Amino acid sequence: MNSSPQQPAIIDIIRYLQTQAGTVCRRPQLGDRVGFALSSKDRVDFTRQTLEGMDADGGYDIVWNDGSDGAEARALPGIFPFRNARLAEVNYDVRGGPDRSICFGLQRLIQLGYDYVGLIENDVVMQPGWFPRLMNLFALAAADGIACGAATVRSYEGRVMEHRAGYSVNWGTGAGMILFARPAAEVILHQYPRLQMSTASIMRFYARLFKVDLNMCVQNGEGKWIQQDSRLTLDWGYTPMLYMHGYTSVGTIPSLARDLEFPAGHFLLSDYVRPERFNAGLVRRRSALPPGQHP
């Protein structure tokens, strides 16, 4: 007979965090405004593909923040033939690196009063039907009693903590394709200087909070998989920060987007989420390790 205490379910830990933070579930409401900050810098072919995928669906606005140098790229916002999406604003010469562009985009969308605040980079391509599926994630989570702070249609198997009915609970959702509920976007913007994490610190975070092990091995020059502490870009800190404020990050099953620049298998990118594979990525519940052996 096993006398060891049963580990709490991930969903129960999430509900506890919500209670502590005082967050509440919210489904999208009629009249809610959705805006995406699209970041671009040259790479016109990538930007066109991103726009074509986005524009398959409507119901949202785009605030386009461009840092391009080339004349062709700078001209694109004025000539792209939008059919469904609404181009609300174009801002040129948004420079200083990706984090400055991200913060500018979040701040601008919040200033404009959007209820849902999104980020899309110009190297992600969505499938038709992506937008209603994205918005439905907030409703699916709310039906489970989950306060969804961030949702994505670009889902990697290795970033899933748990598969639910119709959606995944994720441990990592980056800036390439993400939609925040407005209060969650305000948290991220306010906490942006505190988002820095490394592979070791993010592993410790999830081991302590959710009792899951993240296998964040990387390949060295000889092709061998090794465990090493690597500094991560700031967007890796989005999801941990949201959990600490009572918000959950979720994704579609299956993934409805693909990355143009980095293929699946690139640094910490596993295969995209598919419906027939459950928790096939890099996350496992923790075994009862002896003291001192936890990450």
Language-model features, listed with the residues they occupy:
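C-terminal catalytic/acceptor-binding lobe
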Residues: 5-22, 29-31, 46, 194-295
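Short, well-formed alpha-helical segments that are part of the catalytic scaffolds
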Residues: 43-56
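A conserved acidic beta->alpha catalytic loop
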Residues: 65-76
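Short beta-strand-to-loop acidic/aromatic patch adjacent to the donor-nucleotide binding site
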Residues: 114-125
